């Protein structure tokens, strides 16, 4: 079964996101705190004719970290070179990328927490003093070569900031916490997407879609496409609040933005463990999902919406979870 509320990109979504991507901070909807800070830091760097300090963007998937990296490069008026932590398998791969940078370039590394430690260590001197030392040759004939780099800005994106080593984290002069979007910002994003793709949607429908999209633009845009399909086949093409509710109900997305996996997590906690506390590993086994998947993909939203609490002894289902699923809560 397809999970429409998965915040990782599916199929051609990365291509679609590039089409929808804003170019400058003034066009970027939401994340006002991060934008306001970046605007000052970028203008100051341009005024001094310096490269921007290295930037770490962290937060759940689908919140626009990659888009923000491109916006930063556009605001600086420089080129952006993109890679990812898993793609840089050895230090030589990173050396080749660094050696190809021009003065002022932005190097964007997505999933930076997944870089091997040997690769990460190459970044330390590159980030701090713009040089790297590389070994040439092997055995007794090997020698170290000092390679100066042009000033550049590294932008790292991660969903797991806690997995970054302290030495790497300390080298980022700017950090931006990307948070779940407010409903009004998400409504505006949905209306913008609908306008770009020439969809007819009412404000009420956009607002309802925003409320059920887990505060995540990627999910909102995905659901919008499926609601459009429903409107074209089951209606006259207009996306109104009635069509939106019927389409999302068909997709098993309830009025709180929970789908069958979220509900399965809560039901397991309530029915099998009397609401908890239950360990994350135990919970993951019971719902047949990987521990990291539960921790990264499902749990953050359930906690943010007040359905689950983290405690020292495990996860606990809240009164809101009982009420939402129609369970009667008995005191232990």
UniProtKB/Swiss-Prot annotation:
Family label: Belongs to the RuvB family.
Keyword Kinase: no
Catalysis: reaction(s): ATP + H2O = ADP + phosphate + H(+)
GO molecular function, a single term: four-way junction DNA binding
Disulfide bonds: none
Subunit structure: Homohexamer. Forms an RuvA(8)-RuvB(12)-Holliday junction (HJ) complex. HJ DNA is sandwiched between 2 RuvA tetramers; dsDNA enters through RuvA and exits via RuvB. An RuvB hexamer assembles on each DNA strand where it exits the tetramer. Each RuvB hexamer is contacted by two RuvA subunits (via domain III) on 2 adjacent RuvB subunits; this complex drives branch migration. In the full resolvosome a probable DNA-RuvA(4)-RuvB(12)-RuvC(2) complex forms which resolves the HJ.
Binding-site positions, ATP: 20-21, 62, 65-67, 128-130, 171, 181, 218
Keyword tags: ATP-binding, Cytoplasm, DNA damage, DNA recombination, DNA repair, DNA-binding, Hydrolase, Nucleotide-binding
Enzyme Commission numbers on file: 3.6.4.-
Function: The RuvA-RuvB-RuvC complex processes Holliday junction (HJ) DNA during genetic recombination and DNA repair, while the RuvA-RuvB complex plays an important role in the rescue of blocked DNA replication forks via replication fork reversal (RFR). RuvA specifically binds to HJ cruciform DNA, conferring on it an open structure. The RuvB hexamer acts as an ATP-dependent pump, pulling dsDNA into and through the RuvAB complex. RuvB forms 2 homohexamers on either side of HJ DNA bound by 1 or 2 RuvA tetramers; 4 subunits per hexamer contact DNA at a time.
Positions bound to DNA: 291, 310, 312, 315
GO biological process: DNA recombination; DNA repair
UniProt binding sites for Mg(2+): 66
Protein known as: Holliday junction branch migration complex subunit RuvB
SMART domains, alphabetized: AAA
Domain notes per entry: Has 3 domains, the large (RuvB-L) and small ATPase (RuvB-S) domains and the C-terminal head (RuvB-H) domain. The head domain binds DNA, while the ATPase domains jointly bind ATP, ADP or are empty depending on the state of the subunit in the translocation cycle. During a single DNA translocation step the structure of each domain remains the same, but their relative positions change.
InterPro entries named in the record: AAA+_ATPase, AAA_lid_4, DNA_helicase_Holl-junc_RuvB, P-loop_NTPase, RuvB-like_N, RuvB_C, WH-like_DNA-bd_sf, WH_DNA-bd_sf
Compartments, as annotated in UniProt: Cytoplasm
Region (Small ATPAse domain (RuvB-S)): 182-252
NCBIfam families: PRK00080.1, ruvB
Residue ranges, annotated region (Large ATPase domain (RuvB-L)): 1-181
SUPFAM superfamilies noted in UniProt: P-loop containing nucleoside triphosphate hydrolases, Winged helix' DNA-binding domain
Region named Head domain (RuvB-H): 255-332
GO cellular component, one term: cytoplasm
Signal peptide: none
């Amino acid at each position: 079964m397809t999970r429409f509320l998965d915040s990782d990109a599916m199929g051609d979504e990365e291509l679609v996101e590039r089409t929808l991507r804003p170019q400058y901070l003034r066009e970027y909807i939401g994340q006002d705190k991060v934008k306001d800070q970046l605007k000052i830091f970028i203008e100051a760097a341009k005024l001094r004719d310096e490269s921007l300090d290295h930037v770490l963007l962290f937060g759940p998937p689908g919140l626009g970290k990659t888009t923000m990296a491109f916006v930063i490069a556009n605001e600086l008026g420089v080129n952006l070179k993109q890679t990812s932590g898993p793609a840089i398998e050895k230090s030589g791969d990173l050396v080749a990328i660094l050696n190809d940078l021009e003065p002022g370039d932005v190097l964007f590394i997505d999933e930076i927490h997944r870089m091997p430690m040997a690769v990460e260590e190459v970044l330390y001197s590159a980030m701090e003093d713009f040089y790297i030392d590389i070994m040439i040759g092997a055995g007794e004939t090997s020698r170290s070569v000092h390679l100066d780099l042009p000033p550049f800005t590294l932008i790292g994106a991660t969903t797991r900031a806690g997995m970054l080593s302290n030495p790497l984290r300390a080298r980022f002069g700017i950090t931006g916490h990307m948070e779940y979007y407010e409903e009004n910002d998400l409504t505006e994003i949905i209306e913008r997407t609908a306008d770009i793709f020439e969809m007819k949607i009412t404000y009420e429908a956009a607002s309802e879609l925003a409320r059920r999209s887990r505060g995540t633009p990627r999910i909102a845009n995905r659901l919008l496409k499926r609601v459009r399909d429903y409107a074209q086949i089951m209606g006259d093409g207009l996306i109104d609040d009635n069509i939106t509710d019927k389409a999302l109900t068909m997709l098993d997305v309830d009025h709180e933005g929970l789908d069958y996996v979220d509900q399965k997590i809560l039901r397991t906690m309530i029915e099998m463990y009397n609401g908890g506390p239950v360990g994350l590993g135990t919970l993951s086994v019971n719902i047949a999902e990987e521990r990291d998947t539960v921790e990264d993909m499902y749990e953050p939203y359930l906690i943010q919406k007040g359905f689950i609490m983290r405690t020292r002894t495990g996860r606990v289902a809240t009164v809101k979870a009982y009420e939402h699923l129609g369970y009667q809560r008995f005191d232990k």
